[in-house]
Amino acid sequence: WIMGHMVNAVYQIDEFVNLGANSIETDVSFDDNANPEYTYHGIPCDCGRSCLKWENCNDFLKGLRSATTPGNSKYQSKLILVVFDLKTGSLYDNQASEAGKKLAKNLLKHYWNNGNNGGRAYIVLSIPDLNHYPLIKGFTDTLKQEGHPELLEKVGYDFSGNDAVGDVAKAYKKAGVSGHVWQSDGITNCLLRGLTRVKEAVANRDSGNGYINKVYYWTVDKRATTRDALDAGVDGVMTNYPDVIADVMNEAAYKNKVRLATYEDSPWVTFKK
């Protein structure tokens, strides 16, 4: 999965997919009442990027629905996975469940079209704080209550705080999650970060009894870092430059080893070599 980083305005969806991304990451900020408000990152953000692009969250979801609904004039068949980077740092811990409920209702209405031929992309809810694990239950319970438990087949989870792998496992246990787990590791492109924890996550994924299904590394903009990440065995690379990742994947060393995921590749099934 080539994951376009910080895609927060509707027009950027086409921009990143046309550069080679089959997945995007979108920031979601919340208001004081835990309503998803804007798709917005804000300052500071990655070096070389504008941090200030934004939409109202529901407008973005509608644009995303168009881009991922077969038959729509805006349809992009390659776009198969969306990571919502949930900016829950502005919330009190006791608002996490409420944020999950409200996010579920917004997605159900504006993205899934109330279960009636809505967007088809797989969704990853990425949460920065392990203490906010109740967001997951708020989200899953709401989809069930609204009569759409089948949509949970399209939803996965990520804790993005670079916490110890064992601590992340405990948070999932509390949240009642087993499966559909992506594990992120990374840092802003302005700084360097080694691959120690990525390798630990990959080992957990491949152990047969770990909690991780897929591992992605962020933010990867350079060819050398891309090669290191592919060599470490990641499933996804988040990037500001999808074309760079696509180029590396076409190099002789990689073109017979890795390929771009398609809609038929389940993002929840651990790939067995």
From Swiss-Prot:
The keyword Iron does not apply. Pfam families: GDPD_2. One of its GO terms (biological process) is lipid catabolic process. Expressed by the venom gland. Its EC number is 4.6.1.-. Keywords: Cytolysis, Dermonecrotic toxin, Disulfide bond, Hemolysis, Lipid degradation, Lipid metabolism, Lyase, Magnesium, Metal-binding, Secreted, Toxin. Disulfide bonds join 45-51, 47-190. The keyword Ribosomal protein does not apply. InterPro entries: PLC-like_Pdiesterase_TIM-brl (IPR017946). Its main location: secreted. It comes from the Eukaryota. One of its GO terms (molecular function) is lyase activity. Mg(2+) binds at residues 25, 27, 85. The active site is at residues 5, 41. Its cofactor is Mg(2+). Binds 1 Mg(2+) ion per subunit. It catalyses: an N-(acyl)-sphingosylphosphocholine = an N-(acyl)-sphingosyl-1,3-cyclic phosphate + choline; an N-(acyl)-sphingosylphosphoethanolamine = an N-(acyl)-sphingosyl-1,3-cyclic phosphate + ethanolamine; a 1-acyl-sn-glycero-3-phosphocholine = a 1-acyl-sn-glycero-2,3-cyclic phosphate + choline; a 1-acyl-sn-glycero-3-phosphoethanolamine = a 1-acyl-sn-glycero-2,3-cyclic phosphate + ethanolamine. It is found in: Secreted. One of its GO terms (cellular component) is extracellular region. Belongs to the arthropod phospholipase D family. Class II subfamily. Dermonecrotic toxins cleave the phosphodiester linkage between the phosphate and headgroup of certain phospholipids (sphingolipid and lysolipid substrates), forming an alcohol (often choline) and a cyclic phosphate. This toxin acts on sphingomyelin (SM). It may also act on ceramide phosphoethanolamine (CPE), lysophosphatidylcholine (LPC) and lysophosphatidylethanolamine (LPE), but not on lysophosphatidylserine (LPS), and lysophosphatidylglycerol (LPG). It acts by transphosphatidylation, releasing exclusively cyclic phosphate products as second products. This is Dermonecrotic toxin LhSicTox-alphaIA2aviii. It comes from Loxosceles hirsuta.
